Amino acid sequence: ELLQIAKPFLTSGGHYLDIGANCGMTSFGLCTPQTQEHCTFHLFEANPDLIPILHETAQHYESFDLRIVHGCIASKPGTSRLCRRIEHTGAAYVGEEGDVAVNNLCLDDYIAENKIERIPLAKIDIEGFELHALRGMRDSMEKGRVEAVILEIAPPWLNRQGHRPADIFEFLADTGYRCFFFRSDDPNRSSESARVEVHGTVLHVYPVEHAHIEGQTDVIAFHESAYFQ
């Protein structure tokens, strides 16, 4: 379902940020004939064990513009310690007890250094560290360069970092975004749906009406300047 909702955003080209790329399933799944010529994929991954896997898989997509970046997407420069789980590489998280130090990367700096003007979509799934990533991209978000964001909301993982779902929603509202649930089976969604047109495709989404989240879910946030003016 995530791939289906992400595809329309890239039909007009631009840069896709995959923050917490893991093995690259989302990015490689979006490598289609429609995105081959006009899209650049930026795959950010903190776990050093996954970087060789991403490079190996990328060899099968040589006609696509894929950029694999090793680093911990954070709100400030420095280093973070990463707690790795051998049995589940995608569940690595930032914590003081981490066994490996990873250099931090602030997305505002990366976006400026690479002269990126338009990001139709960013996906963020970094095991509770999402708010740090958002804070490190605040300037780009406030300016509307990031037109939409899909991110995981997992209360236990957020709590591990001292954050709540409400903190995420407040940040997104402050930077000019409206948040929606999009999974058809999401128990958090309201009965009232909304229609948002993305480059000719109509998405049926459900407004986030409160910050109490049941279980683990994903939300999509649209910048008002791109979709509501």
What role is predicted for each listed range?
Residues 1-229:
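Phosphate/nucleotide-binding beta-alpha loop and adjacent structural elements of enzyme active sites
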